[in-house]
Amino acid sequence: MLGAHAIEVGPLGMLAINISLLAMVGWALLRAERGLPDGREWTLLAMLAIFGIFGRVLLEPLPNIQPVTVLVLLVGVHMGAKRSIALAAVIALGSNMLMGHGLWTLYQALGWSLVGCLGAFAATHLNTLPRIAGAAALCGFLFDWVISLSILHTLGPSMLPAYIIAGLPFDLLHAMGNLFFAAWLASPLADIINRHQVVTL
């Protein structure tokens, strides 16, 4: 399974991936900046990015358990889609610069961006810990399935269902890890964001 993600893209392909990720971060930051009341929320986002990057790197020995999915979901809920997209792309690129960067980085950025957007669009319903935890668990599966699409570059669509089924134990680990991180982070992160009076856009 791991070999399916080890795609040789060459220098030009890697440049295209890096430009795509940079464009994603730039677009999200520029769009979000238009409604920026002050600079404090950017400091908060930078701190969350650092936490997400180091959380992912340090928890690498635990298969598919990391705080990033929950962080991006909660930023989507409390700060909006644009800021969650920026956070998702920065964490994906920043952590993969340490762990290994390639085509999968783009899929991770897209998967976490989708999680953040879902958090933003469902924000009015994600107002209790059980709902946030349930959404976080489901987002573990969603993120992993988006990442699985990267095998289409090497194995083709006929292998995708088998690949997803083979990955279900790892998806379950991701979902369980997300339950833990949601219980740990949901309330404190909401309090921190509210203290900075961030307006959802």
What are these regions (language model features)?
Residues 48, 84-95, 131-141:
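Central hydrophobic cores of alpha-helical transmembrane segments
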